[in-house]
Curated annotation (Swiss-Prot):
<comment type="similarity">
    <text>Belongs to the class-III pyridoxal-phosphate-dependent aminotransferase family. LysJ subfamily.</text>
</comment>
<dbReference type="GO" id="GO:0030170">
    <property type="term" value="F:pyridoxal phosphate binding"/>
</dbReference>
<feature type="compositionally biased region" description="Low complexity">
    <location>
        <begin position="411"/>
        <end position="429"/>
    </location>
</feature>
<dbReference type="Pfam" id="PF00202">
    <property type="entry name" value="Aminotran_3"/>
</dbReference>
<keyword id="KW-0808">Transferase</keyword>
<feature type="binding site">
    <location>
        <position position="142"/>
    </location>
    <ligand>
        <name>substrate</name>
    </ligand>
</feature>
<protein>
    <recommendedName>
        <fullName>[LysW]-aminoadipate semialdehyde transaminase</fullName>
        <ecNumber>2.6.1.118</ecNumber>
    </recommendedName>
</protein>
<feature type="binding site">
    <location>
        <position position="284"/>
    </location>
    <ligand>
        <name>pyridoxal 5'-phosphate</name>
    </ligand>
</feature>
<feature type="region of interest" description="Disordered">
    <location>
        <begin position="408"/>
        <end position="429"/>
    </location>
</feature>
<keyword id="KW-0457">Lysine biosynthesis</keyword>
<dbReference type="InterPro" id="IPR015422">
    <property type="entry name" value="PyrdxlP-dep_Trfase_small"/>
</dbReference>
<dbReference type="GO" id="GO:0042802">
    <property type="term" value="F:identical protein binding"/>
</dbReference>
<keyword id="KW-0663">Pyridoxal phosphate</keyword>
<feature type="modified residue" description="N6-(pyridoxal phosphate)lysine">
    <location>
        <position position="255"/>
    </location>
</feature>
<feature type="binding site">
    <location>
        <position position="283"/>
    </location>
    <ligand>
        <name>substrate</name>
    </ligand>
</feature>
<comment type="pathway">
    <text>Amino-acid biosynthesis; L-lysine biosynthesis via AAA pathway; L-lysine from L-alpha-aminoadipate (Thermus route): step 4/5.</text>
</comment>
<dbReference type="InterPro" id="IPR037537">
    <property type="entry name" value="LysJ"/>
</dbReference>
Length: 429
């Protein structure tokens, strides 16, 4: 039983009452975080292997980011991008300094889906084309433009023809023949994640990404890599494309870019940027000085602390530990750096629930069968050991079939008691 079940929270009640209802809320209220640990309102600690869907790769409340935000909040928080700002210029210099060579122009925005919307528009103006190739099992965002690149039907179907699927061809991730057939002289861009996250934590092969680079050049299309979750040290490199020796024409960036503040970007080649007409795209809050200060601090901390190396070393350590678990329920452990998925032979939801409620470990799903771990790169090996031990206990102790059978027996017993009670009531009357 969690603390909130023992002591109902006014904050939980308020959030559930006033929220839009589109989120499936956990029965817990988090109030504080530091490094790889978060605490709920009752003081219970959790090892966080979700970190805001991969945002806090640098850890929660990194002192450099906190200091930068506090100082900037006392100076200037908002300034439109039509008016240059010192922190924005500083951030752009830092960002271009870590980007793959040639990606030296940046459109700043606030979220991953906004970055993908920008990528779509820049691809259209750069090529004069409006068809796209995206990946089955891929996830590119939920706003209407980005949603057209997202494969999962449950995200698209409620909005019908408002989602422009007719201009998008989906190919099987990793299938070279399908990719070659789909990319034509009408294709503006190929959109893909170097590691599919929502699609089950599936790293691409070097051959597939390299062929995507070759064929897009041949056909005059752009290659746009979605590095929203993989970027900024998550996979053991600053960007996942570095594992494959490929430089795209553009990259969508968000999540870990600025230490937890809502910041995103579309980074691109100059020839892509130069073909967008002035005023062809824009944003109100993108590039605001507060987020830019956080971004500068975050990027500098990543380099100084060797965050990519930490993710590479700790990711290999964690995957070795997970692969050592002797459980017939595990089909495969896969990933890159600290982007790790454990595919089970049955649905993952009961195990994810038990990890949170019984073990104090936060993790999440990636497809119904995969448990996804996205710990911060600052997680200690001792904490990794605790997470793996907790997962092994959960695999051993949780039996969804037995629990479901017990629920059914309880329901049948309750129905029987109600029938007996009704019979006694009739006799009494």
């Amino acid at each position: 039983m969690t603390g909130n079940e023992q002591n109902p929270s006014k904050w939980l009640a308020a959030e559930k009452k006033y929220d839009s209802g589109v989120y499936n809320k956990h029965d817990v209220v988090m109030v504080r975080g530091q490094g790889a640990t978060v605490w709920d309102e009752n003081g219970r600690s959790y090892i966080d292997c979700v970190v805001g869907y991969g945002v806090a790769t640098l850890g929660h409340s990194h002192p450099d980011v906190v200091k930068a935000v506090q100082e900037q909040a006392g100076k200037l928080m908002v300034m439109p991008q039509t008016v240059p700002n010192d922190k924005r210029a500083e951030f752009l210099q830092e960002l271009v300094g870590v980007l793959p060579q040639g990606l030296d122009r940046v459109f700043l925005c606030n979220s991953g889906t906004e970055a993908m919307e920008a990528a779509k528009k820049f691809a259209i103006t750069a090529t004069g084309r409006s068809r796209f190739v995206s990946m089955k099992r891929g996830f590119s965002g939920r706003s209407l433009g980005a949603l057209s690149f997202t494969w999962e039907p449950k995200y698209r179907e409620p909005f019908g023809d408002a989602v422009d699927n007719k201009s998008v061809d989906f190919v099987t991730y990793g299938n070279l023949d399908e990719l070659r057939a789909a990319v034509t002289e009408q294709t503006a861009a190929v959109i893909m994640e170097p590691v599919q996250g929502e699609g089950g934590v599936r790293p691409a092969s070097a051959e597939f990404i390299q062929e995507a680079r070759r064929i897009t050049r041949e056909k005059g299309a752009l290659l746009i890599l979605d590095e929203i979750q993989t970027g900024f040290c998550r996979t053991g490199k600053m960007f996942a494309c570095e594992h494959f020796g490929v430089i795209p024409d553009g990259m969508t960036l968000a999540k870990a870019i600025a230490g937890g503040t809502p910041t995103a970007a579309f980074a691109m080649m100059s020839e892509v940027a130069d073909r967008m007409p002035a005023g062809g795209h824009g944003t109100t809050f993108g590039g605001n000085p507060l987020s830019m200060a956080a971004g500068v601090a975050s990027l500098r901390a990543m380099k100084r602390e060797g965050l990519a190396e930490q993710a590479r070393e700790k990711g290999a350590y964690m995957m070795d530990k997970l692969r050592a678990i002797q459980s017939p329920k595990i089909r495969e452990v896969r990933g890159l750096g600290l982007m790790i998925g454990v595919e089970l032979k049955e649905k993952s939801a009961p195990y994810i629930h038990a990890m949170e409620h019984d073990e104090g470990v936060l993790c999440l799903a990636a497809t119904p069968l995969v448990v996804r771990f996205l710990p911060p790169a600052v997680i200690s090996k001792e904490q990794i050991d605790q997470v793996v031990a907790a997962f092994e206990r959960v695999l051993n102790n949780v039996n969804p079939r037995e629990e479901r059978q017990a629920e059914l027996r309880a329901q049948q017993s309750e129905m029987g008691q109600q029938q007996v009670s009704q019979g006694e009531s009739v006799q009494t009357e």
